[in-house]
Structures are given as structure tokens and as C-alpha cells.
Amino acid sequence: MLSTMPRASLILIALILATASAGPVAQQSKPQSAQTKPLFSEDFESGKLDPNVWTQQITGDNVITVQQDKVAHGKYALKVSCPVPAQRTLALLFAKNLPEPLRHHLFGRAYVYITSGVPARHTIFFTAGTTGFPASKYQEVATSNGNFQVTFIDRADANEDWHAAGQVPVNRWFLLEWEFNDQPDQATVWVDGEKVIDTPFSYHTPGQSTDLVGGFTDITLGFRLRGAAPVPFDIYYDDVALDAHRIGAVR
């Protein structure tokens, strides 16, 4: 009887029988979910700074504010401003008690906009280290003479190890990423996804050091100027995050 059936019908019957004998069809795996939230993050979208997370330290006429005029994403971003010429001045946010997985190795991400007046002298953007900045041990992302600089600083010994490379973009938003490692001591900086610095720290040893900081418990964000600011400048930060792996761009 089957021999008299059209060939197309025979193929259809064979497919039905094969499907039935194979049992239920396996469920397709779902697409990867959205990126999990970093261990520490601040997008400033509340429109204000949470005093339970951040404390401030400001000198002179400097200003720290959450504003809407210039943002990378969303409605709000942080602005730290040096509105008049100054000498050895700062405007910093402090956060303490970083999550344990970040204590010896962390990755950071921030969107940054720097006006063209940023001083040529050493200016700190971000630090991670022990409690008591600046009289503490820490690693930093900074600028000097228009380039990025990463530094290990031990103020107790009044000594440091620093490395500079890569021009700092001005008058536009850019994606700044960094890696700080304390075991062994090393720092990396990426700008818009391109690596600009990747260096070990060597301090009181002939080669790469380890555990110089002794644990990243506290961070600072903003600016600390270690020289003169001959003209006013502003720095904007948005979508700041820290995690135990590289975070990448906002998705």
C-alpha cells in the first residue's frame, strides 16, 4: 500500500515517525541575559549624591554637583569644577568599604568629559587604596602634561612609582577603563576600548612588586591637583563602576 503513495507523503510520514520516536524536542536555550550589575556602581540618576555612599572633600572655590547640562547617558552626571585659578587644590568624592572581591584586584569604568583647561601638572582622577587618602597607600589614574598617568604612592615613605602614556581627550566624552592589581602590582588603562598603558609597579625591589597597597578598601573620584591650575576647568563623570572583571561600555 505504501508503494502506491506519492513520494512527498512518504517523506512526511517518515518525519512524523522520527519526531515521535525521538521524544520531546529539546527547548532552545535563551539568549544571554543583560550584563549583571557591577559590584560597585554609580550612574547619578537619582539626581543627588547618596550620603550613605559618598563623602566630599573640597578646597577653595571648587564645586561638586550632580547636573543635567552635560551627560553621557541618562539624565544626570557628576561635575567637579575648578572655577578660578588655583594652586594645589581638590574636589573629591570618597567611598569606603569596597566589596571584598575588589580588595586586591579590580576593574573600573567611567565616562569622562574634560574641558581643555585641565592643568598640565599632575592631576589625579581616581584612586583606590587604604583609608586615609592622601596619607595612605594607593594606585591612581591621573594626568600629567596632557597624558594619562598611573601611579603607586606610599605617602609614609614619600615615594612613588609612576608611568605615563596616551593623550587625554578633551572637550568630548570618552570611555575610560582601568585595572588595578595589588598581587602582583600592576595597572592598565584603556581609552575608548584601546589600551594606552599596561605596566607593573616596582618599588623597593629589583622587579615587579606585590601587595604594595595592602588592599583596596577606599576610592576617590574627582580631581586633586598637585600643582597650579592657571585657568578654570571642569571634569564630568558618568556611569562609574567597579567589578572583578573588565566591565566595558554601557549597553
Predicted regions and their residues:
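Bacterial N-terminal signal peptides
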Residues: 10-20
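Extracellular carbohydrate-recognition regions
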Residues: 29-58, 238, 251
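Extracellular, beta-strand-rich glycan-interacting domains
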Residues: 42, 231-248
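Extracellular glycan-recognition surfaces and repeat-rich motifs
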Residues: 48-80
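Secretory/extracellular carbohydrate-interaction modules
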Residues: 75, 79-150, 241-250
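Short, aromatic/His-centered strand-loop micro-motif at the edge of beta-sheets
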Residues: 153-175
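Localized edge beta-strand/strand-to-loop motifs within extracellular or lumenal beta-rich domains
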Residues: 172-188
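Flexible glycan-contacting loops in extracellular carbohydrate-active proteins
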Residues: 200-235
